[in-house]
């Protein structure tokens, strides 16, 4: 019993330290790098010179930019043209806010252009990390390849994923996930952030503790994946963990 108690105490200490490190990372100047790129470089260059550089695309009227990430050959980021920190922002559950996940799905074409040939939809994934699972304080959705093992697991669970948020059998990458099936028409009309906030008990009050991902299934539906921070299991809710920025799935 003493050993079990000591182990539990050690886990708590590790969790607290991990949380502290995450907070420290987000309070430095480097955590504003993406915001500065968007607001001080991409947006002004588009407005003054009709050139989105260093972004790949700038859509001021639609409220977003697309930027090639330095990590990985095909990874892109979709970000707002105004200040939104992350999943904790109440703006994401405001119906007037752009449907950033749907916009990010449209932006997957940049992966194909960079690759030189079409990247199959089954190889693409979208992910946004929780407040403690991210390193940047400007909202950004990762557009990248899915890990082959995650792809296989989702394929095997196709019949187990319903139109309600339910635990995904076995979780992903050692962490618990909720999964929800959505059709394309649903996705066009309603943001995944609103689905999570309105359909999962108490999620609205704790949106910043969630990471969210989206993947297309073989039946042309989409699966939304949500994981909530749990420091006791060392889960920082970094939904980006389902992605493989080196794109092994294309080899």
Curated annotation (Swiss-Prot):
Protein's organism: Escherichia coli (strain SE11)
Highest taxon, organism lineage: Bacteria
Biological or metabolic pathway of the protein: Phospholipid metabolism; CDP-diacylglycerol degradation; phosphatidate from CDP-diacylglycerol: step 1/1
A Pfam family the protein falls into: CDH
Biological processes per GO annotation: CDP-diacylglycerol catabolic process; phospholipid biosynthetic process
Membrane spanning residue stretches: 4-24
EC number: 3.6.1.26
Gene: cdh
Entry's Gene Ontology cellular component terms: plasma membrane
Localization, UniProt: Cell inner membrane
Topology class, membrane: Single-pass membrane protein
Protein family: Belongs to the Cdh family.
The protein's name in its UniProt record: CDP-diacylglycerol pyrophosphatase
HAMAP family, sorted: Cdh
Primary residence: membrane
Keyword entries, A-Z: Cell inner membrane, Cell membrane, Hydrolase, Lipid biosynthesis, Lipid metabolism, Membrane, Phospholipid biosynthesis, Phospholipid metabolism, Transmembrane, Transmembrane helix
Catalysis performed (reactions): a CDP-1,2-diacyl-sn-glycerol + H2O = a 1,2-diacyl-sn-glycero-3-phosphate + CMP + 2 H(+)
GO MF entries: CDP-diacylglycerol diphosphatase activity
């Amino acid at each position: 019993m003493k050993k079990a108690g000591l182990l539990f105490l050690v886990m708590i200490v590790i969790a607290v330290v991990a949380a502290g490190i995450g907070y420290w990372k987000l309070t430095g100047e480097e955590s504003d790098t993406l915001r500065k790129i968007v607001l001080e470089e991409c947006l002004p260059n588009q407005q003054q010179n009709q050139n989105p550089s260093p972004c790949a695309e700038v859509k001021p009227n639609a409220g977003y930019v697309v930027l090639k990430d330095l990590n990985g050959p095909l990874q892109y980021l979709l970000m707002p043209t105004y200040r939104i920190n992350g999943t904790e922002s109440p703006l994401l559950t405001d119906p007037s806010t752009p449907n950033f996940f749907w916009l990010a799905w449209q932006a997957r074409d940049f992966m194909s252009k960079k690759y030189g040939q079409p990247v199959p939809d089954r190889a693409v994934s979208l992910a946004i990390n929780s407040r403690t699972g991210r390193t940047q304080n400007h909202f950004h959705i990762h557009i990248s390849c899915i890990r082959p093992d995650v792809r296989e697991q989702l394929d095997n669970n196709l019949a187990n994923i319903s139109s309600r948020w339910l635990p995904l059998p076995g979780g992903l990458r050692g962490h618990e996930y909720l999964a929800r099936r959505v059709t394309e028409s649903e996705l066009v009309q309603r943001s995944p952030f609103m689905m999570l906030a309105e359909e999962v008990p108490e999620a609205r009050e704790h949106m910043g503790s969630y990471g969210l991902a989206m993947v297309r299934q073989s039946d042309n539906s989409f699966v939304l994946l949500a994981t909530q921070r749990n420091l006791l299991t060392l889960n920082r809710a970094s939904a980006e963990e389902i992605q493989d920025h080196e794109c092994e799935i294309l080899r």
